[in-house]
Swiss-Prot record:
Name used for this protein in its record: Dihydroxy-acid dehydratase
Keywords from the UniProt entry: 2Fe-2S, Amino-acid biosynthesis, Branched-chain amino acid biosynthesis, Iron, Iron-sulfur, Lyase, Magnesium, Metal-binding
PANTHER family for the chain: DIHYDROXY-ACID DEHYDRATASE DAD, DIHYDROXY-ACID DEHYDRATASE, MITOCHONDRIAL
Function: Functions in the biosynthesis of branched-chain amino acids. Catalyzes the dehydration of (2R,3R)-2,3-dihydroxy-3-methylpentanoate (2,3-dihydroxy-3-methylvalerate) into 2-oxo-3-methylpentanoate (2-oxo-3-methylvalerate) and of (2R)-2,3-dihydroxy-3-methylbutanoate (2,3-dihydroxyisovalerate) into 2-oxo-3-methylbutanoate (2-oxoisovalerate), the penultimate precursor to L-isoleucine and L-valine, respectively.
Cofactor stoichiometry and binding remark: Binds 1 [2Fe-2S] cluster per subunit. This cluster acts as a Lewis acid cofactor.
A Pfam short name: ILV_EDD_C
HAMAP family: IlvD (MF_00012)
Catalytic activity: (2R)-2,3-dihydroxy-3-methylbutanoate = 3-methyl-2-oxobutanoate + H2O; (2R,3R)-2,3-dihydroxy-3-methylpentanoate = (S)-3-methyl-2-oxopentanoate + H2O
Length: 557
């Protein structure tokens, strides 16, 4: 039986003789035209350490596809570095790159009639971009995560890239020496691999194990390790088998499997960006999913992993402690996962977890039993109020009291806010408002890691609030609320905030409120005028014209 269900459209028959001529130029033989064509979407790039170690994974996948009797077809996908673009205009391209990656994969797979695709990626937007594409095209696919970076070390302390961001605030506050500042800078990123805490890349890759679209244990392996190469090869072999079975993404990505993925995100203390990305993945798979679903899951799934940014450990520690399968086994035994969901292996999630211990190892402190959870409920809360009628996202772990009422300090761009923080013009009790940074207004919802890390570095993490219609890095923690919708650019209430207005953030009551009476807000609304778009040409202008609101995943199609 042949399994080239799709590629036969461009390899078979008299009319396709010119096509075969071109394949012969690539080294194909006559017998190859009856084999499935498997795409390898290779995100390798020397732009960022997140992607600089992907070539050997892609090479391993290519070899495994050949060994499995299929034809590998490698093509490139773009990336930008969220960490390097942070705090600059370049960060506006980050979320846009999610859409570009999805479109690139769709274009190549559909244009070339590939029978399946192995997606290999590393930096933050690579994961949702790839999964959006797989859900959209519904061609057999698997996700291979590039793996995490190893932690850095300086004077007995473990470091991640967030250590460098927070050091900026500490150094400018006089709380860190020049020697330590440079020591952190030089040692925070010692290897290739994605940022090491439960930040966005590790959040999304971990959730893909629960979603059923990546192999177990693959998300917490370190990029430099041989087991990561071996896992990439095994992923490719599994994908070829999925092609033979005609097992497609939408057989795996269901509302129940998304609930599994989000449950793991809650249990591990994952990134706020996961809210945006799973709205987009669900949209691509044509699944009914809303921000209210996140809140529903948050209320029943505890945080059981002590992971950075609000905890102590990093992804390599989680891997040594049993990885995501150990987390999932605890959740499954507690009735918090759907064990009957299909996975890319052709087995159910429960079958995949059958041999995982029911109790975490006693010699580790990363994964806690359910009855010893760090927090009884999840950490990604959906806040509403007159400042966010359509919702906003807050990360509420790591704080002694996630409640603040204080005067608004209003900024219409990130650079002005960062300067105010570093110049000590932001004080305890203030609520920083960063606006006109939403999907349309930014455009692209840039991440606010630079100002939030500066607040932490200044020692104000527990006493200063920050709200924005932009996003936060997975490395952010503190009294922060993002994804405010409606955004300022379309006239959301956040556009009406004035310097000194009283704002309340209350994560206990799930409230984000501007304490100004309705009559005054009505007067301000009449006077408000939409600003001119920041960009009128190029990819940012295209994105701004197409982007949906944050509460709909900020998708473009």
């Amino acid at each position: 039986m042949s399994y080239n269900r799709r590629s036969k459209n461009i390899t078979q028959g008299v009319a396709r003789s010119p096509n075969r001529s071109m394949y012969y130029a690539l080294g194909y033989q006559k017998e190859d035209f009856d084999k499935p064509m498997i795409g390898i979407a290779n995100g390798h790039s020397t732009i960022t350490p997140c992607n600089a170690g992907l070539q050997r994974l892609s090479d391993a996948a290519v070899a495994a596809v050949k060994d499995a009797g299929a034809n590998p077809q490698i093509f490139g996908t773009p990336t930008i570095s969220d960490g390097m673009s942070m705090g600059t205009e370049g960060m506006k391209y980050s979320l846009v790159s999610r859409e570009v990656i999805a479109d690139c994969i769709e274009t190549c797979v559909q244009g070339q009639w590939m029978d399946g695709v192995v997606v290999v990626g590393g930096c933050d937007k690579n994961m949702p971009g790839g999964m959006i594409a797989l859900a959209r095209i519904n061609v057999p696919g698997i996700y291979v995560y590039g793996g995490t970076i190893r932690p850095g070390h300086w004077k007995g302390h473990d470091l991640t890239i967030v250590s460098s961001f927070e050091a900026v605030g500490e150094f400018t506050a006089g709380r860190m020496s020049q020697e330590d500042f440079e020591g952190v800078e030089k040692n925070a990123c010692p290897t290739t691999g994605s940022c090491g805490g439960m930040y966005t890349a590790n959040t999304m890759s971990s959730s893909f194990e629960a979603l059923g679209m990546s192999l177990l244990y693959s998300s917490t392996m370190a990029n430099p390790d041989q087991e990561k190469v071996d896992s990439a090869a095994e992923s490719a072999r599994v994908l070829v088998e999925a092609v033979k079975k005609d097992l497609k993404p939408r057989d795996i990505i269901t509302k129940q499997s998304i609930e599994n993925a989000v449950s793991v995100i809650m249990a591990t203390g994952g990134s706020t960006n996961a809210v945006l990305h799973y709205l987009a993945i669900a949209h691509a798979a044509e699944i009914d999913w809303s921000i209210e679903d996140f809140e529903r899951i948050r209320k029943r799934v505890p945080v059981i992993c002590d992971l950075k940014p609000s905890g102590q450990y990093v992804a390599t520690d989680l891997h040594a402690a049993g990885g995501i399968p150990q987390v999932m086994k605890l959740l499954l035994d507690a009735g918090l996962l759907h064990g009957d969901c299909m996975t890319i292996t052709g087995r159910t999630l429960a079958e995949e977890l059958k041999d995982v211990p029911s109790v975490p190892r006693a010699d580790q402190k990363v994964i806690h039993p359910i009855d010893q959870a760090l927090y009884k409920e999840g950490h990604l809360a959906i806040l509403k109020g007159n400042l966010a009628e359509d919702g906003a996202v807050a990360k509420i772990t790591g704080l002694k009291n996630p409640v603040i009422t204080g005067p608004a300090r209003v900024f219409d761009d990130e650079q002005s806010a960062l300067a105010a923080i570093l110049d000590d013009r932001i004080r305890a009790g203030d609520v920083v408002v960063l606006r006109y940074l939403g999907p349309q207004g930014g455009p692209g919802m840039p991440e606010m890691l630079a100002p939030t890390s500066a607040i932490i570095g200044k020692g104000l993490g527990e006493s200063v609030g920050l709200i924005t219609d932009g996003r936060f890095s997975g490395g952010t923690w503190g009294m922060v609320v993002g994804h405010v919708a409606p955004e300022a650019f379309v006239g959301g209430t956040i556009a009406l905030v004035q310097e000194g207005d009283s704002i309340t953030i209350d994560a206990h009551k799930l409230l984000l409120q501007l304490n100004v009476d309705d009559a005054e807000l009505a007067r301000r609304r009449v006077a408000w005028k939409q600003p001119a778009p920041r960009y009128t040409r190029g990819v940012l202008a295209k994105y701004a014209a197409l982007a949906r609101p944050a509460n709909q995943g900020a998708v473009t199609g």
